Regions:
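C-terminal catalytic subdomain
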Residues: 169-378
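Short hydrophobic beta-strand that contains or immediately precedes a catalytic carboxylate
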Residues: 37-40, 125, 177-179
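Catalytic core of PPM/PP2C metal-dependent serine/threonine phosphatase domains
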Residues: 56, 72-135, 163-170, 234-243, ...
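Helix-loop-helix
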Residues: 58-101, 197-226
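A contiguous pocket-lining binding segment that forms or flanks enzyme active sites
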Residues: 153-178
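Short Pro/Gly-enriched beta-strand edge/turn motifs at strand-loop
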Residues: 3-12, 93-99, 231
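N-terminal entry segment of metal-dependent catalytic domains or homologous docking segments
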Residues: 1-64, 130-136, 140, 144-149, ...
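A short secondary-structure junction signal
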Residues: 124-127, 135-138, 143-146, 154-156, ...
Length: 378
């Protein structure tokens, strides 16, 4: 059995400024074996972000359910359905704007993250900076998708940008969590990105472990209890640093043999000085970098002498200089990445770069018909 739940909470900043929740979330059953989890985060700078996110979650889930193959040995069929459904969600937003607010498409932008899971397989699609993590049957958490932002941190959103990341997990899933960045940035923080365990495992477990080994007759009560506990916790002072809207849609296989104690995790060793040095290194002025870094050291170690502070500054500034020299040497070295090496590096679970012929055929033949279907529903 696949246990599931979802919720969306208005963020602290939005409450303070009397702004509605821009997030939407949804769970939809395809069959007794497959379920869909989906979240969307309307872009905060858009006037009608909440409308865009609501359209996106409803349309992508409905289109996936309508077209999902009951069984297929060709994973391209699943990729094509997800790809078409994500385009469908984007097109549905455009149709809504055309009919209700012509010329204002930029006021209706949203992210979108969708997962489709059975007890054996996990397919996914993502657009923007919402995220998906999954737990496998060996007790390992995985970052399934990458956040899509430009160099200035601006999100690539739909319907304007359609840079879809679509794929299949290459492990047996036990659980999957689709999250908007209000939760994702705490479950998969930047401070852990180079760590052995890039997921905040104790926090992630709060969303998952209630269902491991859960008996079917206890499932409704357990789901409600978990959901209420999570909402209470996220709204408490323990999470006051989480100020954005928060959404999660979860799918968990209750028949898995995995137990909570089998989930792998180690206390992370984080070099906060290295993180701070990377942050201040964005400033072109050496004087500014050193000043900000020394202020940080002094704040963390008020009893330190100036000599101790200078010694630590020297350690990190030397490391930075060494890295720069290495990078310069790499630029002078011919690129040895052959096509075969590049192919090996490509994620085995990702959708192929060349658009699938099956997908082309589906989109080419059905676009007009599907677009009419969206118009009827709007």
């Amino acid at each position: 059995m696949i246990s599931s739940y979802c919720f969306s909470l208005v963020g602290r900043d939005h409450i303070k400024n009397h702004i509605p929740c821009h997030d939407s979330s949804l769970i939809k059953a395809i069959s007794s074996s497959w379920k869909i989890a989906v979240v969307a985060d309307g872009v905060g700078s858009c006037k009608h972000a909440e409308i865009a996110s609501e359209i996106a979650v409803n349309e992508v889930a409905e289109l996936i359910k309508k077209q999902f193959p009951p069984s297929s040995s060709d994973e391209r069929a699943y990729f094509s359905v997800i790809h078409a459904a994500m385009h469908g969600a984007a097109n549905a937003i455009e149709v809504y704007v055309e009919e209700n607010d012509p010329g204002n498409e930029m006021q209706y932008q949203t992210t979108l993250a969708v997962a489709i899971m059975s007890s054996k397989c996990l397919y996914y699609g993502s657009a923007g900076d919402s995220g998906i993590i999954a737990l496998d049957d060996q007790g390992n958490y995985h970052l399934v998708t990458k956040k899509q932002n430009d160099d200035l941190g601006r999100v690539y959103s739909i319907p304007t940008n359609r840079l879809f990341e679509i794929g299949r997990a290459n492990y047996i899933p036990v659980a999957v969590l689709c999250m908007t960045d209000g939760i994702y940035d705490t479950i998969a923080p930047v401070t852990l990105q180079n760590n052995k365990f890039p997921v905040n495992v104790p926090f992630a477990n709060m969303f998952v472990t209630y269902a491991l080994g859960l008996e079917k007759f206890k499932e409704p009560e357990a789901v409600e209890s978990c959901k209420n506990s999570l909402i209470k916790y996220l709204q408490s002072d323990e999470c006051k640093h989480m100020t954005d809207d928060m959404s999660v849609a979860a799918l968990i296989n209750t028949n898995s043999d995995l137990q909570p104690e089998d989930i792998k995790w180690e206390e992370p060793q984080i070099d906060f000085y290295a993180l701070k040095w990377n942050e201040v290194s964005l400033y072109p002025s050496i004087e500014t970098r050193n000043k900000l870094f020394k202020e940080f050291i002094r704040e963390k170690n008020p009893e330190w002498t100036e000599r101790q502070i200078d010694e630590l500054l020297e350690k990190y500034s030397k490391t930075d200089a060494s890295s720069s020299a290495t990078d310069d040497m790499k630029k002078l070295t011919p690129d040895s990445d052959t096509k075969s090496n590049q192919d090996e590096k490509r994620n085995a679970s990702s959708m192929p770069e060349v658009q699938l012929e099956l997908d082309k055929e589906m989109m080419g033949k059905n676009t007009r018909g599907i677009r009419g279907f969206w118009k009827k529903r709007s």
